[in-house]
Amino acid sequence: MDVVRISAVKKSGLFLCGAMLISSSAVKANIDIGVVLDGSYQNESRHWGSRDKGFSLGHSELVLSSNIDHHFKGQLVTVLASHGGETELELEEAWIETLSLPLGFKLKAGRLLSHIGYLNNKHMHEDAFIERPAVYRAFLGGHYFDDGVQMSWLAPSDFYLQTSIEAFSGKPLDAGYSDPVSVGVYTANVQIGADLGVEHSWRWGVSALYNANGRQFVHSESSDHNAHDHHHDHAGHSHGPAITGRHLYGTDFTWKWAPEGNYRQTNLRASSEFWYLDNRFDPQMANVPGAEQAAQGWYAEVAYQFQPSWTMSTRYGEVRTVEGDVHAHGDHLHGEFSRGDLKEWDVALDWHASHFGRIRGQVTYEENVDGDETLFSLQYVMSFGAHHAHAF
């Protein structure tokens, strides 16, 4: 995705002018404007993570949305984040969506979050933890958004049934091809769910993603970069998936409980996802010692709001994969693959005096081939202005 880096001197003036222009125009155009401020501190960088060691700007958002007319609505989301001492401005969403198609169909076009999985189409500030699960960071770069189109259908019934198909450029998931397929990614997703009385509800989904530009291949030793340099701008930080392949399959399940249906007082959410990535390498790369065509990962998490202002969350996840630096030198190859597995356990405690402000403390234990690590993190997530309801 296109990223604009702006200096500390310029950014304050740029956003002050932008905010003044937006607020003036919004009064006339009846545009909903929302801001999410996200900042954090952590004692070490996370494996495949996106946040710097120490203090950093997390995933702060400026959201503009409005109905265009009775046929269309639109939304634009820009994100500010800091990586390696630089501040990045990124356009995360810029889409239009139909409002009047018959029979429960909707068409969305532009830059949008893919509808695969449970977490991917949610904004990062909705999460119960500072970073997405390791399997999301490894296979989707945290969350996958792209330029393309999405067609969805919601069944007109009490039983929840929604399906969607998507076509995207695939650039964020490109393994480094010099002439990639222009429409490189196709996805499909099916979700079902229901309420069980007033206290319980559940949702189950299956997803599939085809990535025409996802198979990794051997680069020459004289190349300026390897297959994934464009995903890693600095060591330890990911701006895209660490692992790509041609086929990605996933399934997710979520269950929610609230005594007497009162989510404001006490509630519990349990969710889990499993992802399987296949066809990772082209034939030449597949013959490298240690190569494995499949990688897989999963996580399970529980978030329990035991008081109106307090939530305790815990999550465990794993990724099983091989990693290596392989390149061609003349008529032979250099390098090999070795285990790159990661196990991760998180515990977080949130204080939230309202729906719009949250302070989080988190402890993470990572176990991988490079050694074990314990991370301590603090985060604030504050929002003001228009704030739309969160999805299930």
Q: Where does each model-flagged region fall?
A:
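Gram-negative outer-membrane beta-barrel proteins
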Residues: Y41-H47, S82-E86, H115-L119, S157, ...
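Detector for outer-membrane/organellar transmembrane beta-barrel domains
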Residues: E199-G335
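N-terminal secretory signal peptides that target proteins for export/translocation
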Residues: M1-V9
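Outer-membrane beta-barrel "beta-signal"
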Residues: T251-F253, W351, D372-F392
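Bacterial N-terminal signal peptides
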Residues: S12-S23
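Transmembrane beta-barrel architecture of outer-membrane proteins
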Residues: G58, E90-E92, S169, G184-Y186, ...
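Outer membrane beta-barrel
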Residues: A29-L173, P180-V198, E301-V322
